[in-house]
Swiss-Prot record:
<dbReference type="InterPro" id="IPR017856">
    <property type="entry name" value="Integrase-like_N"/>
</dbReference>
<comment type="similarity">
    <text>Belongs to the TACO1 family. YeeN subfamily.</text>
</comment>
<dbReference type="Pfam" id="PF01709">
    <property type="entry name" value="Transcrip_reg"/>
</dbReference>
<keyword id="KW-0963">Cytoplasm</keyword>
<dbReference type="InterPro" id="IPR048300">
    <property type="entry name" value="TACO1_YebC-like_2nd/3rd_dom"/>
</dbReference>
<dbReference type="GO" id="GO:0006355">
    <property type="term" value="P:regulation of DNA-templated transcription"/>
</dbReference>
<keyword id="KW-0238">DNA-binding</keyword>
<dbReference type="InterPro" id="IPR026564">
    <property type="entry name" value="Transcrip_reg_TACO1-like_dom3"/>
</dbReference>
<dbReference type="InterPro" id="IPR002876">
    <property type="entry name" value="Transcrip_reg_TACO1-like"/>
</dbReference>
<keyword id="KW-0805">Transcription regulation</keyword>
<keyword id="KW-0804">Transcription</keyword>
<dbReference type="GO" id="GO:0005829">
    <property type="term" value="C:cytosol"/>
</dbReference>
<dbReference type="Pfam" id="PF20772">
    <property type="entry name" value="TACO1_YebC_N"/>
</dbReference>
<protein>
    <recommendedName>
        <fullName>Probable transcriptional regulatory protein BH3259</fullName>
    </recommendedName>
</protein>
<dbReference type="GO" id="GO:0003677">
    <property type="term" value="F:DNA binding"/>
</dbReference>
<dbReference type="InterPro" id="IPR029072">
    <property type="entry name" value="YebC-like"/>
</dbReference>
<dbReference type="InterPro" id="IPR026562">
    <property type="entry name" value="Transcrip_reg_TACO1_YeeN"/>
</dbReference>
Length: 239
C-alpha cells in the first residue's frame, strides 16, 4: 500500500502552488460538516474528521473559524454531496467527490472534464466497486514496532502497517479513524503527517507515456473545479 502514501504525498507537495484553492475546499467542507450537525467537533464526528485532515494541510485557524461561524450564524446556503464515477484513457478508473450548491453546473463541468481529456462518465457503481474505503493515518518518529505495540494496547486490528520515508502509515477501516488517532495521542503524538479517509484501488494500472500525460491533465482539470473535493484513481503514476 506504500504507493497510496506516495499519491497523497505528491498531492501535499503540489498544494504549495494551490494553497488558496485547498483552503477554499476545506472551508466549504468544514461549513457543511458544522451545518449538518453540532458546530462542536467533540459532538460532531464528521466535523472532527475534517478538522483533523485540515491540520495536516496547515489550513489557517482563521479559515476554520470563519467556516464554523458561518454555520453557526444560520446561513441558508446548502450543498449536496455527490460522487461521480468515470473512465480515463485506456480504461483507467476515476472517482470524483464533490460538494455543490448547483448540481447541474457540477455535473456539466465534470462531464466536460472527462470528455475533453480522453475519458467518459460512467454510471453510479461502475468504478467504486474496484476501490476500498480506507482510513490512512501517518506519523513520524515511531517505528513499526512502536505503532504495532500501541495498536495492540488499544485492541485495534488494522488492515496494514507500512514504514516509508521515515513515516509509519496505518491503513485501517474507516470507522477506526478516530480510535487509531486516539491511540497515537495517548502516547504523546500531536501532529500527523497524513490523516485521511481515502478510496484505495484494489489494483493499479500503468499507462503509456502519451496516455499518462493525458490522464494527468484530466486529474488536474478535475481537481481545479471549484465544487470538486477529492479525486481518486487507479493509475500508478510512477512518482
Amino acid at each position: 500500500m506504500g504507493r497510496k502514501w506516495n499519491n497523497i504525498k505528491e498531492k501535499k507537495a503540489a498544494k504549495d502552488k494551490n494553497t488558496s484553492r485547498i483552503y477554499a475546499k476545506f472551508g466549504r467542507e468544514i461549513y457543511v460538516a458544522a451545518k449538518q450537525g453540532e458546530p462542536d467537533p467533540e459532538l460532531n464526528q464528521a466535523l472532527k474528521f475534517v478538522l483533523e485532515r485540515a491540520k495536516t494541510y496547515n489550513v489557517p485557524k482563521a479559515i476554520i473559524e470563519r467556516a464554523i461561524e458561518k454555520a453557526k450564524g444560520g446561513s441558508d446556503e446548502t450543498f449536496d454531496e455527490l460522487r461521480y464515477e468515470g473512465f480515463g484513457p485506456s480504461g483507467s478508473m476515476v472517482i470524483v467527490d464533490a460538494l455543490t450548491n448547483n448540481v447541474n453546473r457540477t455535473a456539466s463541468e465534470v462531464r466536460a472534464a472527462f470528455g475533453k481529456n480522453g475519458g467518459n462518465m460512467g454510471v453510479s457503481g461502475s468504478v467504486a466497486y474496484m476501490f476500498d474505503q480506507t482510513a490512512i493515518i501517518g506519523v513520524q518518529g515511531k517505528t513499526e514496532e512502536d505503532v504495532l505495540e500501541l495498536l495492540m494496547e488499544a485492541d485495534l486490528d488494522v488492515r496494514d502497517l507500512v514504514q516509508e520515508d521515515e513515516v509509519t502509515i496505518v491503513y485501517a477501516e474507516p470507522d477506526q479513524f478516530h480510535a487509531v488517532q486516539e491511540a497515537f495521542k495517548q502516547t504523546g503524538v500531536e501532529e500527523f503527517v497524513v490523516a485521511e479517509i481515502s478510496m484505495i484501488p484494489q489494483t493499479e494500472v500503468s499507462l503509456s507515456q502519451e496516455d499518462q500525460e493525458q490522464f494527468e491533465k484530466l486529474i488536474d482539470v478535475l481537481e481545479d473545479l471549484e465544487d470538486v473535493q477529492q479525486v481518486y484513481h487507479n493509475v500508478d503514476l510512477g512518482e
